Amino acid sequence: MPGDVEGCQHLKLKPADVENYQKICTQIFSCHFVPRRCSTCKRINKRSIRCLSCHSVGCLWGHHGEEHAMEHTHMIGVDVKNGHTYCFGCQDYVYQTELETLRFKIKNIKAWQSDHKRLPEKYNQMVCLEAYRKYPPVCATAGLRGIQNLGATCFMSVILQSILHNPLVRNLFFSGFHTSTDCKRPTCMTCAIDDMFSSIYNSKNKSTFYGPTAVLNLMWKLSKSLCGYSQQDGHEFFVYLLDQMHTESGGGTSMPCTCPIHRIFSGSLKNVVTCLDCKKERVAVDPLMDISLDINEPTLQGCLERFVSKEKVQYSCHSCGSKNAIKQLVFDKLPPTICMQLKRFEQNNFAMSTKIDKQVSYPAFLRMRYNFNQDDVDYQLYSVVCHKGTLDTGHYIAYTYYQNQWFLLDDTTIVEVKESEVLNSQAYLLFYHERQILYSDEMTVKTEN
């Protein structure tokens, strides 16, 4: 297990690197003039990385930055939009204390703002960064903060954002169901999540972003599969996080579980097998923590209908011995919060993982029915996780609904966006919460962000 939670194996700072980083950040945050055009394709891109070792600029998603890095062994670069450090060897943003401290100081020095009036002649060919910022920057506020990338941890950040903006989870932690100051466990993930809620929703906290070092340290200690700086899957971390908090909140193995985490995220799914000859049914009920959908339809509704559609199976009937049967999945109980995974990663005939880039449309409001004859349940979309790039060289971003407005969260960067952008994005994970929650027979509470 790594002994340090910052940097990466490729980030070995030299004095010249720190000096170059200071110059790049000064250009970004003082005069807003910085080389943004890719040195190879000459295009201006949303994500451009400037080499820390030389003056080359490469587009991130066009792979020209990566080609330069591999050719010259210049693995470390700087995002010209925000000054964050990017490693082409790890294929993700990385965190280093000295550089991040320097970036933060430069960003807040007001004296540099007038320097653009005295730019040397060589800067005439540079591109004004402000002219190509699609959206105005959003100031962090209580409840809305970016999460720092500590080195290939964007998969973790997007899931933490979905947890932070789930109104049921938020109310659960605000109710004091678990407080880190009272917990006696030496290692407790729920304590780390409680501290995260306290920090991010604290109006007196003036930090523009949150550093999830405690969550990362605990994840490395408690989960071998998620340990290290290699590329990880956001859905796998989501499943791990719920299971860990379920265990720490007193949840057992018997189902249905009544722990607070399962009350929010867990439902049940019926697996019904019907013999085609004698019509006898075999019914098995399994817990439902999320829904993994094959991308065979252009809409989410179509994918859900395919998920519960009947299919012929080979089955040995205990009553008549027939081998012919029909299997169907039925939503037995729908949870207050649903996570839907669009299965974008699959293995081909050569046992290699590939990514499916097919577009699937999904609504802001979703109506679902369970157990055939039950009433419909209305859900509202509150968080979307997207995976950019390829399986091995990708990056996670999230959209979240907060105070009646959608925001794009890209590590520490926060921008306000229109709902149309969210609904047109290529989603990997969709998070819906029930629009109306019945806490008891006498009380109905609406969940509103």
Swiss-Prot record:
It catalyses: Thiol-dependent hydrolysis of ester, thioester, amide, peptide and isopeptide bonds formed by the C-terminal Gly of ubiquitin (a 76-residue protein attached to proteins as an intracellular targeting signal). The active site is at C154 (nucleophile), H395 (proton acceptor). It holds the Pfam family UCH. Residues 145-435 form the USP domain. It comes from the Eukaryota. InterPro entries: Papain-like_cys_pep_sf, Peptidase_C19, Peptidase_C19_UCH, USP_CS, USP_dom, Znf_RING/FYVE/PHD, Znf_UBP. Zn(2+) 1 binds at C8, H10, C87, C90. Zn(2+) 4 binds at H178, C183, C188, C191. SMART domains: ZnF_UBP (SM00290). Zn(2+) 6 binds at C275, C278, C317, C320. Transmembrane segments: none annotated. Its EC number is 3.4.19.12. Keywords: Hydrolase, Metal-binding, Nucleus, Protease, Thiol protease, Ubl conjugation pathway, Zinc, Zinc-finger. Its main location: nucleus. Zn(2+) 3 binds at C51, C54, H68, H74. Zn(2+) 5 binds at H246, C257, C259, H262. Zn(2+) 2 binds at C38, C41, C59, H64. One of its GO terms (cellular component) is SAGA complex. A zinc finger (UBP-type) spans 6-113. One of its GO terms (biological process) is regulation of protein stability. Component of the 1.8 MDa SAGA (Spt-Ada-Gcn5 acetyltransferase) complex, which is composed of 19 subunits tra1, spt7, taf5, ngg1/ada3, sgf73, spt20, spt8, taf12, taf6, hfi1/ada1, ubp8, gcn5, ada2, spt3, sgf29, taf10, taf9, sgf11 and sus1. Histone deubiquitinating enzyme component of the transcription coactivator SAGA complex. SAGA acts as a general cofactor required for essentially all RNA polymerase II transcription. At the promoters, SAGA is required for transcription pre-initiation complex (PIC) recruitment. The UBP-type zinc finger domain is required for the interaction with the SAGA complex. The USP domain is the catalytic domain, but it is only active when in complex with the other DUB module subunits. Belongs to the peptidase C19 family. UBP8 subfamily. This is Probable ubiquitin carboxyl-terminal hydrolase 8. It comes from Schizosaccharomyces pombe (strain 972 / ATCC 24843).
